[in-house]
């Protein structure tokens, strides 16, 4: 006989759906700049979840010496054939280096040359030892004031009324528990949508894609179903690869 479904009610000021790199850093930022309560809901565990769950060997968006944020905007605009929001790109590019320096303070190992400068890899990248990127970020989140984490809870729908969002509902993937979360503000940080197309690699390698297969597009669906305004859906990035190459990123 199965146990009856338990329903838990939670109230918070800010609900962050998704505990990947973006969700965790958002929680850190809010905690540092306010006294509001924050709840991070993650369907896996924030220590190893999201695009950087397994780590990364470079910061692939950085303004190296001699370059400006606008240079990155120009590069990304050309790469996407002009189908971009330049304002969003510039806002992000202006924060690249500050966030990178912050991650170094949290313990991220960034390779440096004999002069103590970051080792650049091209015009927009620097080399790192980033296998522990996510654990470092998770540790910082757990130490932050007024931040709670719900691991292994999958959020499925937003709660809306009169065109406004006031929370979300979801369920535990480990226990027979449903969650009703009320929040004054909701931030969706669930990543993109992987697996839309047939995998490039066969068998056990089919998960070697640009984004983790667990990025299901759930955040997009929640927004669309709730009437949220969506943007930049006109452009779909596809990483180009050389024939017979098995790699998670592009090779061209």
Describe these PLM feature segments.
Residues 1-13, 21:
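Generic start-of-chain signal for non-secretory N-termini
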Residues 18, 183-185, 189-190:
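Short, well-ordered coil/turn residues at beta-beta hairpins
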Residues 3-6, 36-37, 43-166, 170-172, ...:
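Conserved N-terminal/central alpha/beta ligand/cofactor-binding core
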Residues 223:
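Acidic, metal-coordinating catalytic segment for phosphate/diphosphate chemistry
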Residues 186, 215-219:
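Extended, hydrophobic alpha-helical segments in both membrane/secreted and soluble proteins
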Residues 14-40:
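N-terminal Rossmann-like FAD-binding beta1-loop-alpha1 element of flavoenzymes
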Residues 9-12, 175-185:
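Core beta-strand elements of the Rossmann-like FAD/NAD(P) dinucleotide-binding domain
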Residues 206-215:
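A short acidic, glycine-rich active-site loop
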